[in-house]
Amino acid sequence: MEEISDPKPNALEQVLPTVPNGKCTAPVQMESLAVDVQKVSGEAKVRICSCWCEIVRSPEDLTKLVPCNDFAEDIKLFDSDPMQQEAESSIGIPLIPKQVTMSHNHDHESGSEMVSNEVMQENHVIATENTYQKSDFDRINMGQKETMPEEVIHKSFLESSTSSIDILLNNHNSYQSGLPPENAVTDCKQVQLGHRSDDAIKNSGLVELVIGQKNVAKSPSQLVETGKRGRGRPRKVQTGLEQLVIGQKTAAKSSSQLGDTGKRSRGRPRKVQNSPTSFLENINMEQKETIPEQVTQNSILESLTIPTDNQSRTYNSDQSELPPENAAKNCNHAQFGHQSDDTTKISGFKELVIGQETVAKSPSQLVDAGKRGRGRPRKVQTGLEQLVPVQETAAKSSSQLGDTGKRSRGRPRKVQDSPTSLGGNVKVVPEKGKDSQELSVNSSRSLRSRSQEKSIEPDVNNIVADEGADREKPRKKRKKRMEENRVDEFCRIRTHLRYLLHRIKYEKNFLDAYSGEGWKGQSLDKIKPEKELKRAKAEIFGRKLKIRDLFQRLDLARSEGRLPEILFDSRGEIDSEDIFCAKCGSKDVTLSNDIILCDGACDRGFHQFCLDPPLLKEYIPPDDEGWLCPGCECKIDCIKLLNDSQETNILLGDSWEKVFAEEAAAAASGKNLDDNSGLPSDDSEDDDYDPGGPDLDEKVQGDDSSTDESDYQSESDDMQVIRQKNSRGLPSDDSEDDEYDPSGLVTDQMYKDSSCSDFTSDSEDFTGVFDDYKDTGKAQGPLASTPDHVRNNEEGCGHPEQGDTAPLYPRRQVESLDYKKLNDIEFSKMCDILDILSSQLDVIICTGNQEEYGNTSSDSSDEDYMVTSSPDKNNSDKEATAMERGRESGDLELDQKARESTHNRRYIKKFAVEGTDSFLSRSCEDSAAPVAGSKSTSKTLHGEHATQRLLQSFKENQYPQRAVKESLAAELALSVRQVSNWFNNRRWSFRHSSRIGSDVAKFDSNDTPRQKSIDMSGPSLKSVLDSATYSEIEKKEQDTASLGLTEGCDRYMTLNMVADEGNVHTPCIAETREEKTEVGIKPQQNPL
């Protein structure tokens, strides 16, 4: 064997293109290769042997060449198979294996020749005579465009693997004495395959990979941390070199190499099947995941080929040795026709030897497996078998494989990857008593050919079927329960009868609540819902008929299969041969299925097994005890329920026709037995009222069941209560306004209007006026009346003086009340009252004030507020209103006088009651109105100058602008609000008083009005009041001082008393300035 040294190793790269077809196969070619190398290198010495041609650059860097005879038979030169030829022809470019250097390791005891991806700056080439099949790399790279997963080892070239590929080396390790140091194989060039792949394969982790050995040395940095799970016990993960073999359906995945595959957010994890043939497909085609870093550039796994019989042997050398860690980090990637863009970084295994029966392990070599956050760790089985992915399930690890099979809730599913299903007789048994990280893997297997290898795939359909069976179990239980709780016809009848009886009881309780008199007859006046009571009675009637139908159905069911009457003799006995089953009609009898006769009234017999449920022999009652069929038992239960609820007396032998026979007869005749007798109605809608009917009195005097009688009996009682209240002077709470007929003539009620007051009075003042009018001057007792009573008389709904002697008529059908018309009438009345009060009360109050205190006047008097009325004008307006309502002029005058006297008396009484010392400081307001030619003068509220200036402005414009008001306020030292109130009061007085013009004229002529006293004893007052009113006022004139008459001069108090007349007017309160009150009264306009 000759040695050739090459001082120019870089020049050897020029030799590579000269190799025919990219291969070094024959010795002739090796000779030509040596010549070419010598020509290029110049100083290189070429030595040619039978099988090797090696170039070295110096004597110190020599590599021993192994003779061809030392190789295994299947590694020698052989032709490619048809599949490889087809792949080669399809690509058109021969595949050149990756740069691989062979180094002789003297320290390894097994003596195997190691192939490592070691490349230093020195480049060496070793040519072998074996040709490699390009189809092997086609399976890896052609059409796949996938990246190698991480943690898949720095692959030393597996020259002893099953594929025979001619290795063309660009770089050769010159170290003779063993494996290169760490980090010596980090930057390799990529060997181009037939076409470029998108991802470059970066492999790191396994520094040494020796095939064919029986020992596998492992260290913590070499093994994969597998089986980690966040929750639940870890999954059993089996790792091995079998997962690196291409050709199966499943691939080894790692969390740092592959994206998390098979993840499911909920439920149990999906089984991820990775085949060796799709090893690279699972990386790039399906996962499309980014390969993490921490991986050195890989030497190509040239040993990942199809495991055939001729390819299952390994290349061993006596002097081979495992390299140290990280020895394969700087290797150049050979380009195999396609160049990957992304790199797959694979780390994890530092040392791995396949093929031995024993696997040497140490704590630093074992996988950190089975870690769990809680609970005991899962037993993780790691071994070489998982590197051969024969099964559809893949070995998974937390650091190398994507976390597959994760479950968001619940404990994890047990994933068992059996060694036999992984394609070999591998026994992975964890040692007991040791930590989960120290697991022993017993492997007694050898690589088998593909022809002998049959993948045993788990049946997914079985798993799905098991899951479906688990889900169907509750359904079966529900069906069984339904069958057990199956209800027959008799049970339905019993249940329905119980429901009907319950509803009847409910409706009866409802009727009893309104039919009783209650304690001391208090329930007689209870409001009774007539329609609801009718509905309840109709409901009870219908339920009884349904109960009758249920008994009819029950008897019909019991009559099926009955024995004919002719079969019984005179004593009621029947021959046993004539007995047949009522259900099946058969007469066949066996010892275990005899016919049993019912002891009820149905005269039927049943087979033991025809009954539902079947009647067993041990449950048959003795002869002295009777046995009833299900139909007779149901009827007995129904009769018992009916008798207890409705207090009936029905027997078992009775027919269904006896059940509620009266109700059935009434229904047949179209009548309802449950009428409304004894239940008075509160229904106010008397649509059957006929005002022209001849027998109204007969209806009223009818029996107690009449609804109208009860209604009007209660109405008469209410009237009596009202009369009692009136006799005690208490106001009535009756406010029924819905019966007022505004178009009706109320001339007969004028007398009542004149004899009553609109306000409640507690004193006897001025009541003789009305008595004198009624009895022609005779003094009568005090008369107390209530405004409600008067209002009822005005509305035409009450004649209390008639008492019980007056005939009672049914209620009228009242039409809708015209409230607008009613409001107009009341408003006109109120205007008349205010006019009279404004003219006469000022005279009476001011006169009494003068008698008590002399001619003193108060600063609180307001000249601005002048309430006077023209009697002629108001009388004429009232006459017109009265004529519209059909009143006569005489009655109008009488009514007007009575109203005047009544209101005068009311105001005097009000002042007497509310008189206090606080009112003594006040004086009567100056009305400034001439009554019967008299004058009165007083100081104005704002002063004479201010009043005169305001009157001038009022004469110019009654509705001044705001700017004018502000100027007046600034001129007179008043507020804008005071000026506005003065104009408002003045406008109202101007509309309702005829003397405003004369006052304005007086102020224009600078004439100060003077106050004149009124002689109460003279004819001046009589000219205002008529004789009847005057006589009463003169009678009570002496008591005004003692009653505090002078204290009521405040206009606001007058307004409070007038407010009792109703909702027809409201007060307009002026502001208070320096404890001086100015009050104006304005009638409210029609709100409608």
Curated annotation (Swiss-Prot):
Entries under SMART domains matching the protein: AT_hook (SM00384), HOX (SM00389), PHD (SM00249)
Gene3D superfamilies: Homeodomain-like, Zinc/RING finger domain, C3HC4 (zinc finger)
Ranges where the record places region 2 X 27 AA approximate repeats: 173-342
A GO CC term assigned to this protein in UniProt: nucleus
InterPro entries xrefs: AT_hook_DNA-bd_motif, HD, HMGI/Y_DNA-bd_CS, Homeodomain-like_sf, PRHA-like_PHD-finger, Zinc_finger_PHD-type_CS, Znf_FYVE_PHD, Znf_PHD
Induction: By pathogen infection.
Zn finger limits (PHD-type): 578-635
DNA-binding region(s) in UniProt: 226-236, 261-271, 369-379, 404-414, 935-994
Role of this protein: Specifically binds to the fungal elicitor-responsive DNA element, 5'-CTAATTGTTTA-3', of the gene PR2 promoter.
Protein name: Pathogenesis-related homeodomain protein
Name of the gene this protein is made from: PRH
